[in-house]
């Protein structure tokens, strides 16, 4: 063997195994060294090849990882998009299914309607055909009769002119009669058609109004939703602000902790916590964005609804215009009917005349048939006979009568037919309207079907494309599987080659080969290479082997590149099909990653093999050296080499088994992939089957649609006639919209006028006295006028008596003056003509005057009625003002609640709110002034009316004076012209007859007018019926609205349930947090106990070095506590997992399917969008909860880690030194100082909050005083209103009396006689009166216009009142719901507090048990140390400092203050009782006065009745007040019971506090005893050790005693601090609970007092009506609900503040746990 080869071999071994040359050279002399070198060379080659492969694999792996990450991101995006598309397609399919179902139902209904219409049409056609046949028969009979009549007329043409004239007259009359009948029937039909159209229009108006109301309701609902969303947004904004504040606090704390050097390590923020906070912020941002989007959508819906409102208003205007036109047409038709009736009357009169003439002619004709006439006719015309003529004539008359009967029958049939048609006209109209609606709906359905067909075609195309993609993906998967199988085969081949190579190792290598390898190892030169090549026949040269390995590497790389290219192409093709098969691809990716991991594992296994070989070499080298040292036998060396080779074979077998296991795992994964692919194929087949079913359904639906289209075409042909009507209705609707705009403007004006009407109240006081004085004056004038009227009546009676006497004288003188009358006839005729003309003119003027007087009287009556209405409106306005005052009081109470809510805000907010209140008060004052101005304006109008009435009375007086003058003149003229009057009386009688005829005519006219009035009354009845029908429809709408409200309540209940689930989960999280806090406290306690044990162990280690003794594990209480903590952590984890499962099982609220099915496509889409948004919101909330769960899990895991560290620390701290405990103590003291500082800051915050609460209470008291002042003012105003009402009633009575008096005067004036001399004067007076009447008419028109405006304003105000009432009801519902929610939360908090008390008690019991266990351990230690105990040294025993009880005294003071408040409340109740007694006394006095004021006059009987009624009302009110007083007594008793219960609870709480104090003192005493026992035991042990060491030195004893005293003092201080802290915590908890209970009870008492005061104030209002009392009671109930809600809210805010304080205390506890971790780490370092 050459030296170069050996050097090369040695160098190879040195490079490969990192072995020095000196260690390798002794191995050269061994025989198997060459074989070993050849094996190493082959192994080197394999390792180098594997290195290259590993490098390539790592590069490819990195490249694949990058590609895969990109693809995964791309696939995730596509998955999200595909999921979204799938959800959209599912939603579309569900919507289409719902639409198909709705279409089917609608089609069934339409088929039923169509069948009914067809049956009705067939019946109508049958009736028409029958009528046509009857008309044809009648026409044929008429034609036959006409032919017969014409033949008879031709035969009897020679009868004479008289018969012909009679027949012609009869025929004309009959034709006229027929025409009149037809005209009347047609006019009636037209009238009925117009009436029906009118009714249809009224019904359309009602439907439009109902739609308008529905739209208004929708607007209100949307506005409420917007308000709710705004509130939610405000809540979210508050949450965001709170989060920002928390983040700021966290950063501040972090900065503070970072400033400290020792604690900076403890509070290092984890990146995971920051990420979680960022995720929470992002989710909350998403929530805010969702709420904002929801609010914007609702606003858009509100805008759309407003647009619909405008359109409907325009429709309403158009309908009103058409109604006006129809009214005009009806008036025209009525006029035409009157004309026709007049014509009919004239024709009837003519018929009667003709019949009379006919009877005379018939009688004359009958005279011809006498025997003489027959003889004369026979002599004159022997061929002509009168008998034939008579018989023929009689036959003709019979035929005419039969024809008349037939005509009557036909007319009856025609009238019956017309009545049937009239009856069926509304049905046909309804059918037409339904047909129009059905056509519109069919058009809508056709459009929706077209859209659905388009969507289905798109979906089908997408399904086909996805199928193709799935097939392509399947092919690619098969190709990839084949590639994987090929690769697995290659791996198997490589493994087989490795096995072959490993087997060749055990064979013997020739010596020449070994020498060559050694030389190559020592000197890797060309010569050594040639030697190796000669010896190794497998390879021609080493370079060729290297080149072959490089070629193989290049081939592998090329193959890998090809594989990567193929994979990229396959993946590019797969990316197109990933939308539907994303799950399978993700699993494949996971499998690839697992394969990469397996390859990594293989590489690691190869590296392990290399390490094994190195170790084998080391062992072989050591064995060779040992053999060389002991004996140089070659056989022993060979044996060692054989053993090493066997070990290598064993390791190789292990490696081979591992590879087989990996291959089996890969095969299992492939099988799993195949099974998943089969499942995917099955799902695809199911989807195909469902798709086929959907296509079949679609084909059926298309067929149905074609049938519907055919029917729709038929219906469209019918609807063409009705489209004109629809266009008119659209125009009317546009006009309605314009009118609505005008109405809104008027409403705004009315609001201003309402504000002005409040000022009228003050002016009424001033005008009351003036009106009373004027009434007195008017009564005096009335008496004077009555006296004048009586004088006139006496004068007229006397005149009538004188006239009667004169008539007797005139009759006696008639005979004497008859001759003179004959002479004066000619002159009298002229005078009579003149008088006749004058009388006619006077009659006309008198009729006109009387008519105008009647119109004036009617207008006065109308004005009086309008005045009454105005007074009623004023009363209503006063009632509304009272209601508004009540609403103002409610708002003030709400304001007080809002002030209580915002206690944590700054004082600037309260000043701003006070400014707002002042501004609102100024607005109210301005409104009050405007109402006063309006009241002044109405009083001015009343004064103007009174002035007009005075003018009319003055005119009447003037007329009376003129009448007196005229009477005197007429008496003189009568005395002078006495003779002339006697001659003219006869003519006067004639004139009287004519006047009677004219009066008859007037009576006929009045009858006509009465008939017209009757018709108008009938129309009014008809309209009233329509109004009743409209009211019924409104009731139905209200019922529907109630149904909708019930549905909404159900939906809200579902939402409430979901919210309750959400709150329950939050409570679970709170429970988990509380348990975590408990665990932290237990952990801190465990740490303290560990420190104590460390100290004890240190002492024992110092004492018992000479005599150690074993301690059993069972005696360690710490280990038991650690075991308990582990169990608690496990329970927490299970609770969190169960909460997650329960959270996943939460279901969304199930909407009502019936209401959803009734919706259309657009409504369904909006509904689905809303639901999706709500689900997104819920998902965000779920994410927040999941993040909180993660945090809790992490805390639990950290606690588990801490427990593990504890367990290690317990084992390690037996050996640790005392120096480490000192460092831990210093850290613990620092932490305690930090906790004390945080507690101080929290106490300062509490004091600030209490100051703010006191300020708010003072403001509330001021507001209460203001409310009392407002109520007093309100009572004064009500009393003034009642006095004004009484005055107005008196005025109305006086006005009615004046009206009666005026009517009597006018009648007397009309009844008085007149002559020709005063006609001119009367004409002039009439002209002047007509002018006055015109002026009065103008004023009346102005007043009417003003009345109409006031009425419209009052209606608008009533609408606003209804809207406000609805809003108030909604708010009350919300308040009740919130109150229920807050009550449940409060109960939960109370239960938690009770649980905490129980836990604290359990902890105390645990502490006592632990102390007892420690005492037992001490006894055991004493027993084990059975050595003589020396005299214990005297140790100073420091007594524990007692805990200060200042806080306990403060709680007692607070309880005393609450008792004082209760005493004040009882005083207030006593005062209320005294006020009630006063009210009773006043009521009794009022009854006595009412009995004394009875007057027995007949004229005042009516007043008595009124007073009796008022007395009855007062008695009923007094009875009600007595009932209320009884209720108040009961409530007072309940309050007293509550006060007693409070006192008892206070006493019990004091006793509990004293018991807790005693328990704490007992604990302290027990601790002292245990400390003394421990000190005694340790002193015994120490003294024993000191006695042992006393022989050596005396200084050692003194040193040990000093150290022992120091440590004992430190222990006592620690124990005292711990006890004081626990005692303070217990006192704080007790004090907080007592404060909460006392505040709750005080709030309840304040509520009851407010309710009692309100009821007392209502009882004081005696003169107010019963309605106001009922409404006041309702307001008090609403005040209860509103007052309960803020109180509950205040309570919860206080509880939340306390929980925040606890949360702020929690971070230092975490720091203690972190301190424990640092301690454990320090222990490890020290070890």
From Swiss-Prot:
Recorded GO CC terms: nuclear envelope; nuclear pore; nuclear pore nuclear basket; nucleolar peripheral inclusion body; nucleus
Keyword Metal-binding in record: no
GO molecular function: structural constituent of nuclear pore
Phosphoserine modifications at: 1706
Ranges of compositional bias, category Polar residues: 1423-1448, 1672-1684, 1702-1714
UniProt KW keywords: Coiled coil, mRNA transport, Nuclear pore complex, Nucleus, Phosphoprotein, Protein transport, Translocation, Transport
Primary localization: nucleus
Transmembrane segments: none
Origin: domain of life: Eukaryota
Segments for region (Disordered): 1423-1459, 1477-1500, 1656-1727
Record note on disruption phenotype: Decreases cut8 localization to the nuclear envelope. Increases kinetochore component protein levels, including cnp3. Asynchronous kinetochore segregation during metaphase, with lagging kinetochores present during anaphase B. Increases spindle assembly checkpoint (SAC) activation and results in mitotic metaphase/anaphase transition delay. Abnormal chromosome segregation; lagging mitotic chromosomes during anaphase B and unequal mitotic sister chromatid segregation. Sensitive to thiabendazole.
Subcellular location: Nucleus, Nuclear pore complex; Nucleus envelope
Job of this protein: Maintains the proteasome and its anchor cut8 at the nucleus envelope and is required for kinetochore component proteostasis. Proper kinetochore stoichiometry ensures the correct attachment of kinetochores to spindle microtubules during cytokinesis. Required for the localization of spindle assembly checkpoint (SAC) protein mad2 and bub1 to the nucleus envelope during interphase, but not their localization during mitosis.
Protein name per Swiss-Prot or TrEMBL: Nucleoporin alm1
Organism this protein belongs to: Schizosaccharomyces pombe (strain 972 / ATCC 24843)
Lineage: Eukaryota, Fungi, Dikarya, Ascomycota, Taphrinomycotina
Protein encoded by which gene: alm1
């Amino acid at each position: 063997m050459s030296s170069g080869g050996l050097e090369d071999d040695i160098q190879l071994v040195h490079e490969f195994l990192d072995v020095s040359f000196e260690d390798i050279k002794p191995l050269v002399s061994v025989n198997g060294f060459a074989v070993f070198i050849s094996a190493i060379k082959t192994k080197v080659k394999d390792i180098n090849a594997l290195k290259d492969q590993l490098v390539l694999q790592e590069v490819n792996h990195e490249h694949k990882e990058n590609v895969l990450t990109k693809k995964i991101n791309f696939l995730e995006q596509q998955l999200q998009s595909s999921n979204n598309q799938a959800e959209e397609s599912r939603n579309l399919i569900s919507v289409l299914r719902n639409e198909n179902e709705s279409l089917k139902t609608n089609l069934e209904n339409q088929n039923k309607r169509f069948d009914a219409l067809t049956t009705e049409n067939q019946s109508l056609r049958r009736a028409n055909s029958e009528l046509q046949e009857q008309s044809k028969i009648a026409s044929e009979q008429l034609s036959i009769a006409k032919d017969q009549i014409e033949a008879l007329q031709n035969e009897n043409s020679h009868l004479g002119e008289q018969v012909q004239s009679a027949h012609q007259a009869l025929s004309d009359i009959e034709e006229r009669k027929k025409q009149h009948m037809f005209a009347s029937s047609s006019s009636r039909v037209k009238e009925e058609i117009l009436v029906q159209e009118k009714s249809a229009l009224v019904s359309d108006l009602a439907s439009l109004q109902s739609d308008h109301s529905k739209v208004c309701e929708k607007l209100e609902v949307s506005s409420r939703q917007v308000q709710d969303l705004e509130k939610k947004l405000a809540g979210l904004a508050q949450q965001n602000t709170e989060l920002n504040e928390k983040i700021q606090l966290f950063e501040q704390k972090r900065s503070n902790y970072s400033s400290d050097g020792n604690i900076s390590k403890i509070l290092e923020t984890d990146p995971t916590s920051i990420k979680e906070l960022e995720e929470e912020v992002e989710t909350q941002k998403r929530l805010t964005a969702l709420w904002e989007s929801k609010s914007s959508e609702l606003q858009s819906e509100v805008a759309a609804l407003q647009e619909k409102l405008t359109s409907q208003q325009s429709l309403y205007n158009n309908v009103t215009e058409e109604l006006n036109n129809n009214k005009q047409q009806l008036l025209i038709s009525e006029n035409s009917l009157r004309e026709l009736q007049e014509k009919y009357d004239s024709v009837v009169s003519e018929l009667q005349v003709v019949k009379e003439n006919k009877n005379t002619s018939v009688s004359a004709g009958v005279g011809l048939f006498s025997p003489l006439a027959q003889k004369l006719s026979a002599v004159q015309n022997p061929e002509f006979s009168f008998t034939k003529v008579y018989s023929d004539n009689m036959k003709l008359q019979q035929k005419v009568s039969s024809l008349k009967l037939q005509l009557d029958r036909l007319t009856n049939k025609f009238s019956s037919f017309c009545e049937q048609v009239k009856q069926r006209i509304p049905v046909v109209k309804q059918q037409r309207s339904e047909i129009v609606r059905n056509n519109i709906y069919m058009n809508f359905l056709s459009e929706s079907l077209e859209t659905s067909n388009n969507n289905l075609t798109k979906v089908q195309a997408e399904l086909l494309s996805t199928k193709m993609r799935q097939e392509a993906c399947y092919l690619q998967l098969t190709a990839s599987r084949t590639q994987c199988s090929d690769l697995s085969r290659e791996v198997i081949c490589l493994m087989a080659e490795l096995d072959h190579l490993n087997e060749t190792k055990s064979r013997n290598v020739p010596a020449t080969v070994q020498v060559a390898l050694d030389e190559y190892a020592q000197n890797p030169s060309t010569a050594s290479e040639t030697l190796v090549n000669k010896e190794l026949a497998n390879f021609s040269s080493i370079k060729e082997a290297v080149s072959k390995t490089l070629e193989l590497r290049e081939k592998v790389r090329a193959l890998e590149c090809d594989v990567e290219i193929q994979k990229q192409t396959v993946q590019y093709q797969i990316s197109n099909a990933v939308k539907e098969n994303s799950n399978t691809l993700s699993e494949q990716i996971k499998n690839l990653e697992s394969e990469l991991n397996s390859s990594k594992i293989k590489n690691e296994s190869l590296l392990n093999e290399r390490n094994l070989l190195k170790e084998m070499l080391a062992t072989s080298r050591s064995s060779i050296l040992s053999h060389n040292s002991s004996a140089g036998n070659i056989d022993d060396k060979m044996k060692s080499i054989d053993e090493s080779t066997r070990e290598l074979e064993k390791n190789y077998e292990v490696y081979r088994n591992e590879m087989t296991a990996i291959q089996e795992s890969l095969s299992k994964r492939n099988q799993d992939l195949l099974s998943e692919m089969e499942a995917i194929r099955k799902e695809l087949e199911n989807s195909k089957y469902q798709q086929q079913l959907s296509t079949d359904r679609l084909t059926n639906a298309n067929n149905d649609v074609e049938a519907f289209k055919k029917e729709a075409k038929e219906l469209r042909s019918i609807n063409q006639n009705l489209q004109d009507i629809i266009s008119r209705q659209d125009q009317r609707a546009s006009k309605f919209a314009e009118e609505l705009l005008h109405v809104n403007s008027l409403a705004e004006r009315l609001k201003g006028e309402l504000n002005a009407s409040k000022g009228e109240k003050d002016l009424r006081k001033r005008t009351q006295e003036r009106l009373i004085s004027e009434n007195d004056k008017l009564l005096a004038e009335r008496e004077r006028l009555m006296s004048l009227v009586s004088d006139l009546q006496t004068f007229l009676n006397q005149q009538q008596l004188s006239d009667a006497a004169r008539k007797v004288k005139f009759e006696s003188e008639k005979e004497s003056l008859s001759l003179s009358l004959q002479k004066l006839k000619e002159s009298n005729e002229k005078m009579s003509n003149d008088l006749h003309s004058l009388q006619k003119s006077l009659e006309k003027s008198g009729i006109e005057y009387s008519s105008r007087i009647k119109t004036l009287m009617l207008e006065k009556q109308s004005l009086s009625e309008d005045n009454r209405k105005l007074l009623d409106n004023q009363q209503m306005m006063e009632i509304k003002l009272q209601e508004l005052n009540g609403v103002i009081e409610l708002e003030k109470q709400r304001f007080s609640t809002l002030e209580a809510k915002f206690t944590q805000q700054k004082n600037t907010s309260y000043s701003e709110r006070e400014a707002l209140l002042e501004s609102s008060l100024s607005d109210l004052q301005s409104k009050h002034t405007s109402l006063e101005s309006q009241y002044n304006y109405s009083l001015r109008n009343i004064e103007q009316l009174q002035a007009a009435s005075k003018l009319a009375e003055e005119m009447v007086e003037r007329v009376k004076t003129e009448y007196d003058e005229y009477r005197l003149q007429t008496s003189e003229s009568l005395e002078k012209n006495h003779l002339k009057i006697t001659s003219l009386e006869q003519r006067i009688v004639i004139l009287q007859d004519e006047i009677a005829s004219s009066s008859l005519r007037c009576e006929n006219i009045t009858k006509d007018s009465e008939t017209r009035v009757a018709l108008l009354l009938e129309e009014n009845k008809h309209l009233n019926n329509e109004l009743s029908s409209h009211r019924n429809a409104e009731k139905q709408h209200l019922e529907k609205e109630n149904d909708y409200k019930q549905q909404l309540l159900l939906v809200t209940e579902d939402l409430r349930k979901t919210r309750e689930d959400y709150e329950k989960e939050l409570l679970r999280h709170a429970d988990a947090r509380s348990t975590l806090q408990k665990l932290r406290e237990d952990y801190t306690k465990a740490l303290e106990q560990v420190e104590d044990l460390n100290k004890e162990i240190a002492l024992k280690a110092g004492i018992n070095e000479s005599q150690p003794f074993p301690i059993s594990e069972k005696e360690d209480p710490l280990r038991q506590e650690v075991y308990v903590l582990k169990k608690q952590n496990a329970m927490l984890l299970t609770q969190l997992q169960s909460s997650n499962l329960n959270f996943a099982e939460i279901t969304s609220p199930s909407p009502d399917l019936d209401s959803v099915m009734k919706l259309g496509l657009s409504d369904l889409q909006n509904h689905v969008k809303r639901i999706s948004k709500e689900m997104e919101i819920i998902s965000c909330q779920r994410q927040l909860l999941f993040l909180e769960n993660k945090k809790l899990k992490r805390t639990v895991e950290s606690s588990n880690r801490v427990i593990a560290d504890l367990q290690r620390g317990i084992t390690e701290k037996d050996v640790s030194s005392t120096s480490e405990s000192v460092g831990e103590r210093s850290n613990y003291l620092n932490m305690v100082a930090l906790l004390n500082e945080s507690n101080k800051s929290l106490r300062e915050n509490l004091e600030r909050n209490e100051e703010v609460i006191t300020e708010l209470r003072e403001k509330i008291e001021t507001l209460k005083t203001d409310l009392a002042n407002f109520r007093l003012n309100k009572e004064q105003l009500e009393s003034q209103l009642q006095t004004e009402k009484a005055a107005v009633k008196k005025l109305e009575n006086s006005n009615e009396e004046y009206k009666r008096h005026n009517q009597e005067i006018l009648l007397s004036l009309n009844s008085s006689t007149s002559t020709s001399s005063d006609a001119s004067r009367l004409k002039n007076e009439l002209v002047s009166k007509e002018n006055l009447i015109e002026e009065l008419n103008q004023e009346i028109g102005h007043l009417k216009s003003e009345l109409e405006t006031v009425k419209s304003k009052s209606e608008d105000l009533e609408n606003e009142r209804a809207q406000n009432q609805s809003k108030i009801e909604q708010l009350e519902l919300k308040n009740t719901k919130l109150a229920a929610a807050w009550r449940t939360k409060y109960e939960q908090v109370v239960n938690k507090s009770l649980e905490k008390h129980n836990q604290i008690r359990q902890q105390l019991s645990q502490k006592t048990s632990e102390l007892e266990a420690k005492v037992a351990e001490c006894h055991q230690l004493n027993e084990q140390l059975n050595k003589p105990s020396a005299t214990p040294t005297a140790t100073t025993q420091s007594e524990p400092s007692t805990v200060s009880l200042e806080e306990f005294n403060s709680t007692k003071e607070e309880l005393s203050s609450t008792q004082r408040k209760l005493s004040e409340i009882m005083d207030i109740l006593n005062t209320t009782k005294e006020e009630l007694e006063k009210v009773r006394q006043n009521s009794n006095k009022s009854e006595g006065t009412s009995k004394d004021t009875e007057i027995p006059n007949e004229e005042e009987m009516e007043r008595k009745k009124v007073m009796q009624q008022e007395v009855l009302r007062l008695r009923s009110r007094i009875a009600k007040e007595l009932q209320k007083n009884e209720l108040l007594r009961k409530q007072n008793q309940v309050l007293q019971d509550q006060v007693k219960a409070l006192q008892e609870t206070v006493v019990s709480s004091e006793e509990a506090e004293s018991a807790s104090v005693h328990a704490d003192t007992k604990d302290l005493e027990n601790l002292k005893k245990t400390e003394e026992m421990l000190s005694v035991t340790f002193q015994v042990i120490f003294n024993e050790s000191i006695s042992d060491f006393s022989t050596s030195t005396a200084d050692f004893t003194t040193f040990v005693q000093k150290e022992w005293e120091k440590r004992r003092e430190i222990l006592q201080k620690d124990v005292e601090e711990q006890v004081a802290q626990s005692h303070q915590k217990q006192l704080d908890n007790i004090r907080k609970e007592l404060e909460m209970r006392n505040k709750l009870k005080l709030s309840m008492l304040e509520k009851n007092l407010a309710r009692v005061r309100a009821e007392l104030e209502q009882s004081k209002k005696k003169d107010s009506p019963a309605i106001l009392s009922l409404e006041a009671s309702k307001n008090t109930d609403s005040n209860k609900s509103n007052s309960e809600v803020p109180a509950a809210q205040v309570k919860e805010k206080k509880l939340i503040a306390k929980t925040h304080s606890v949360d702020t205390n929690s971070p230092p506890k975490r720091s203690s746990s972190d301190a424990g971790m640092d301690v454990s780490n320090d222990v490890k370092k020290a070890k």
